């Protein structure tokens, strides 16, 4: 038995930030770039053994994360700096470990989570941006953020989100519990901030797509409630683009004592 095999297995959680614009999503896939594949490769180099990670939320192609949480198991005995600075040295520049925490055996990045929070960032200006073009969604028509805010409040609580669910969604149920949804303007940026126990596929982007129709004056404020009641995806607006969406935080029971960082995206006020 090798010295590595004699070491006890420990479970470690990491906070991950990434720019998803050059990846085909979080999940490892054959022959395409994924965030999971890059992270596992870097961790395996530091651990000197194969590492498999489990995440809180599998983001789609082009979607970003400032508050993704993962866990993995390893026999490798390393200082915390190895799992942060060491792993970051082996990662591409658009993925970074933000924190590390040793967690008990019952912790699971996905199944221990009690809520997930996303922010969708709209650059609301008649001319398109260049510097942040892969980190925001450009919408050239003027948006009334206060109108969007009022229209969105009907989504609070536990509801059937069939009208905002992708056709290919594999979830067993369309019911989700939305804890808050806020629409706020920061200068030229309009941010939709939504927190729920979980999300059906494309739920945030489908909600934002419809809210932009309300904000632009193309639909009345009451339209969001009508869509929710209709339970018909074909009645809602087109899915908003991926580049404006960020997974910004994941909630866990307090006894895990995971680090809490500023929400992000970092170019906006928290």
Curated annotation (Swiss-Prot):
Residues 107-111 are annotated as: RNA binding. It catalyses: uridine(38/39/40) in tRNA = pseudouridine(38/39/40) in tRNA. Its EC number is 5.4.99.12. Residues 168-172 are annotated as: Interaction with tRNA. Keywords: Isomerase, tRNA processing. Pfam families: PseudoU_synth_1 (PF01416). The keyword ATP-binding does not apply. It comes from the Bacteria. The record marks 58, 78, 110, 126, 139 as: Interaction with tRNA. SUPFAM superfamilies: Pseudouridine synthase. InterPro entries: PsdUridine_synth_cat_dom_sf, PsdUridine_synth_TruA, PsdUridine_synth_TruA_a/b_dom, PsdUridine_synth_TruA_C, TruA/RsuA/RluB/E/F_N. Homodimer. PANTHER family: PSEUDOURIDYLATE SYNTHASE (PTHR11142), TRNA PSEUDOURIDINE SYNTHASE-LIKE 1 (PTHR11142:SF0). Formation of pseudouridine at positions 38, 39 and 40 in the anticodon stem and loop of transfer RNAs. This is tRNA pseudouridine synthase A. The gene is truA.
């Amino acid at each position: 038995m090798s010295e590595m095999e004699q070491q006890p297995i420990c479970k470690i959680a990491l906070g991950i930030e990434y720019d998803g614009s050059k990846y085909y999503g979080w999940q490892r896939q054959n022959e395409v770039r994924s965030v999971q594949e890059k992270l596992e490769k870097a961790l395996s180099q530091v651990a000197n053994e194969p590492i498999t990670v489990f995440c809180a939320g599998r983001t789609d192609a082009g979607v970003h994360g400032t508050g993704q949480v993962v866990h993995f198991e390893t026999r490798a005995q390393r200082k915390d700096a190895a799992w942060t600075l060491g792993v970051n040295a082996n990662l591409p520049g658009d993925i970074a470990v933000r924190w590390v925490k040793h967690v008990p055996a019952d912790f699971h990045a996905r199944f221990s989570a009690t809520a997930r929070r996303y922010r969708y960032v709209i650059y609301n200006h008649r001319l398109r941006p260049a510097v942040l073009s892969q980190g925001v969604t450009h919408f050239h028509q003027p948006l009334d953020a206060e109108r969007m805010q009022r229209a969105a409040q009907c989504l609070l609580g536990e509801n059937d989100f069939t009208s905002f669910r992708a056709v290919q969604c594999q979830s067993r149920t369309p019911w989700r519990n939305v804890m808050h949804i806020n629409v706020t303007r920061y200068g030229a940026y309009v941010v939709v901030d939504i927190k729920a126990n979980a999300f059906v596929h494309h739920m945030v982007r489908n909600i934002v797509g419809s809210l932009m129709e309300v904000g632009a004056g193309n639909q009345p404020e009451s339209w969001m409630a009508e869509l929710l009641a209709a339970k018909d995806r074909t009645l809602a607006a087109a899915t908003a683009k991926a580049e404006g969406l960020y997974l910004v935080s994941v909630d866990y029971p307090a006894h895990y004592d995971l680090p809490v960082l500023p929400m992000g995206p970092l170019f906006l006020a928290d």
